[in-house]
């Protein structure tokens, strides 16, 4: 059974309430599946500009993710998530893949966008698209693929953002989805000599890959 709970967040988000209200983002939780359908990761020969995706059979962690919610969703307010990345080389983005899952309420769709940076936070939209039909939360490892209409040049050493958001009104303003965590966000801990235990980091980094051409 899915659960919602409050946790800390270090990337960026946008809520429908004012910042001074001290809103904190909410997570989605599900029982991870024991059956993993291998992800299809850039079979078209594109190169990796950025990725925190795991191997195809474990591309992301299907048990936890940040909610992506519209203002009319069951959450009662909007919650949008942004993931920063910095290209190592001048590149051209042609495709973005993200681990978005459907949390069982509202229209099964959201808005993905590639954004500029603005003083360390999400800036202006470079290109965006409505993406639909996410796999159910608690399943792995189908990725949501967005092939950009126009290849977008990005500059080495400059921060950009991949953003998952929703419409403020109309179809999709009621969606309750989740951007699942990267498996590369795991760490081991050992308390009082009780043995090593794997756990998710408290940072909760959303899983995604940015692909294209690198001269």
What are the roles of these predicted feature ranges?
Residues 17-21:
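Sec/Tat signal peptide C-region and signal peptidase I cleavage site
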